[in-house]
Amino acid sequence: MCIRDSLCIAQKIVSKAEGCIYSLNDIKPSKKALKISDKLNKDPRKVEIILRESKNIIRIFKHKNQNEGVIICEHKLGFISANAAVDESNTGEIDTIITLPKNPDLSASKIGDYIYQKLNVSVGVVITDTFGRPWRLGQVNVAIGLSKVPATIDEKGKSDISGRRLKVTEPAFADEVAAASGLVIKKNSNTPVVIISGLNWKQENSKSNDLLRKIEEDMFR
C-alpha cells in the first residue's frame, strides 16, 4: 500500500469490535418508545434504542403498504438517517441490535495508527455505513468515520475544460470513496474491508462531520 490508498471498513465490524451490540431482551421501552411503536407497528425495544441513539426525531412515517414504519432521526453524531442507523442485519445472534460506533473518527484513527505501527505505511481510513437518500431510491455507502482522507476537495477557483471558473464545486471525496466500496462490501459478501488504490488525493485532518450541512444552511428543516 502507498499513501494514496484508502482502507474502507464496514461500520458493522467496528461496532462489533467496540461492543456496540445489544440484546433486545435487556431493553425496557420508555413510554415515548411505546407510543411511537404503536404508530409504526415497530418493536418498542427497537424504538427505545433508536431514541437513545438520537439527538432529535425529525419525522416518523409509515407508508400504507409497509408493515413497519421508519423514524428519521438526527443521530447523536449529527448524521440524518433512518432509525438512527440501528441495524439488525449480520449481528450474529437472534434478537440483537447493532448501533454506530461511539466515535467513528477516533476508531478510524486508531486503525490507521495500528497499520502504521505494524507496516510503517500511512494509509487513509474510511469507516462506512449504508444510508438511504430522501429523493432517490436505493441506498449507498457513506463515510461516517475518517482518518487522513479528505472529507471534501475544494475545486472552487479552478477552471473546467472549457476554461470556465468553478464557483461552487466541492466533491464529497470521502463519500465517493465510501460509495465505491459499496460495490464490494455487501450484506452477504463476507467482505467488510476494501482497499481502494490509485486515487489522487493528499492526506488531511478531516472529520466526518465536515460532511454535514450546517443547520442554518439546511433548506428542509
Model-identified regions with their sequence ranges:
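Short, small-residue-biased leader/transition segments that mark boundaries at the very start
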Residues: 1-3
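A structural signal for small-residue-enriched, beta-sheet-centric alpha/beta enzyme cores
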Residues: 11, 21-24, 32-95, 99, ...
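Activation segment
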Residues: 17-18
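Glycine-rich and polybasic anion-binding loops at the starts of cofactor/ligand-binding domains
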Residues: 105
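Active-site phosphate/pyrophosphate- and oxyanion-stabilizing loops and adjacent acidic/basic residues
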Residues: 113
